[in-house]
Amino acid sequence: MCGQICKFSTFEFPKIKTDFITSIGSMCRVAHHLRKNHLRNLASPLDWMINDKLEVVFELFKSDFKEFFLSCSFVKNADDFIGKADIYRQVVRDDSNDMVAIHYFYSYEDLETQSKRINTQARKRWVLIKDKICSSKNVVFMRSGEFDLETSKEFLHNVSKLF
């Protein structure tokens, strides 16, 4: 690495006015970069989660995260998510929402106790975020991963009707 030249791309993004920015997944990098750039004002239940579908995110919003990780199971191929096996960290799938948590569950506590705690924590975080969304004029939902314009439009349309 010593002496290696790295090329960085810069992008001209339009300036926008926003009252609130929140992560809606799909992996850890959104929450990481929001925090790194001092833009992560509130912790989102979707921070650090792996999820593939905006439809699931909307359904969680609509249900106030009521069933979030209450029906869950250990992922058998955990190494695919966390690389080298970790004796403490457990990879857990929310069976109801097809979402994967790689940072919240540990081997030294039973799954049911942890899932109830994660659900309670997520619901408390969601109340704060929901209040902030409702009191904001301009909200930015940030997400990493594959982008489909039609799916994103539908998500934003549904969220705008919800709030």
Model-predicted regions and their roles:
Residues 2-163:
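Extracellular glycan-modifying ectodomains
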